[in-house]
Amino acid sequence: DFVIIDFEGEPRLPLSERTSLLVGGRWSDAYFEDTEAGNQRLTGTLGLERRMSERSTLSLNATAERVEFDDESVSSNYDRQSGYLEYAMQGARTNLSVRAGGTVLHDYGDTTNGPLLNLTVERQVTARSTLTLNAGTELTDSADALRREQQIGGIDLDGGNPIVSTDQFQSDFVSLAWALEGARTTLDLAVDLRSEDYERDTTFNRDAIGATGSLVRRLSARLSWRLYGGWSKQ
């Protein structure tokens, strides 16, 4: 079992009619039962965004993060910085977001770097259904990877089948999700493929595929039931 608590804010400060300053901050506390991998992290982001048209923006972004473990005898604290360009476009039925850059990690005198790429395409198939493709690669850790999986497949009360480690790893991933929003019924289906290459303990390296499904039925304004299922192989 695991618990991840986030407090986040992302104000946008206009500098001119088409240019804005992006400032963000997040504090996160991750707790993992039966392990010593729990940690707290403080993240700050700074970006300069330019509106290219009524429906598109281009921004230059920098992120700095400090991760401190509950038990420093298990793993050393580390710093992580990322820089990337992001292009975002909102169409009549299609939304597109592309990030491209890199990440540098400083861990007790050692420096590791890796590419940062993220593509998200969201297509409104009908008035009530959407299809979302997400693919990319990033230098990440257990808490961030779990957060991403929950965003893709929804909240899994069992936590799925995650690897919990204090080690960082390069994650390559692709997912496809379909969502149907009815008047009283919501259906979410997702498939996810990923490859993880760990920096220190290579025994954790894995290639995995998974699928999730969630059906929610609202019986009244205050009462609903939910059916959830998941499958994974590695």
Which role fits each region the language model picked out?
Residues 1-234:
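Gram-negative and organellar
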